[in-house]
Amino acid sequence: MVLKVKMGDIGVAKSPESIETLLGSCVAIILYDRGKKIGGVAHVMLPKSRNSSEKNPGKYANTAIPELINRMAKLGARKDKLTTKLAGGAAMFKCNSNTIDVGKKNIEASREEVKKMGLRIASEDLGGDTGRTITLSLKDGSVLVRTGSELKTI
């Protein structure tokens, strides 16, 4: 079964399921506990929430990661066993000096928050100007990234 994660949402599951999301300028924060075969994806839309009691914690990098870790822990995952991967953050629209590159800001914030949580990024597929679909296999923690007709595993 495939768990589909919508924009600004968080999904967690155990093997043999997989988790999938479609990304543009958003960033997927992907965590996986290899020993327990538990994984999760946060579909981050924006860099930071100023509200610590955010109703939709998956929407922001600074609230998504702690919530993702908590939800995975409820299934039995351990923070010290997590592998971290990032994908997304495309520049979907032409940016000029007067516009903000949301994809770039999401990448920067996601990396910063991962570091703050004491996690290390194992691999990533970030940036560019094309959206992508990612699928996390909870059997082995591999992440299939589809960008147009291109496929790669991170």
UniProtKB/Swiss-Prot annotation:
What family is this protein classified in?
Belongs to the CheD family.
Root EC class: hydrolase
Name the UniProt record assigns to this protein: Probable chemoreceptor glutamine deamidase CheD
Catalysed reactions, as listed in the record:
L-glutaminyl-[protein] + H2O = L-glutamyl-[protein] + NH4(+)
Classification via Pfam families: CheD
Q: So what does this one do?
A: Probably deamidates glutamine residues to glutamate on methyl-accepting chemotaxis receptors (MCPs), playing an important role in chemotaxis.
Alphabetically, the GO molecular function entries are: protein-glutamine glutaminase activity
List GO BP terms, alphabetically: chemotaxis
EC annotation? 3.5.1.44
- Keyword terms: Chemotaxis, Hydrolase
Cysteines engaged in disulfide bonds, as pairs: none
Q: Which domain of life is it from?
A: Archaea
Record CDD domains: CheD (cd16352)
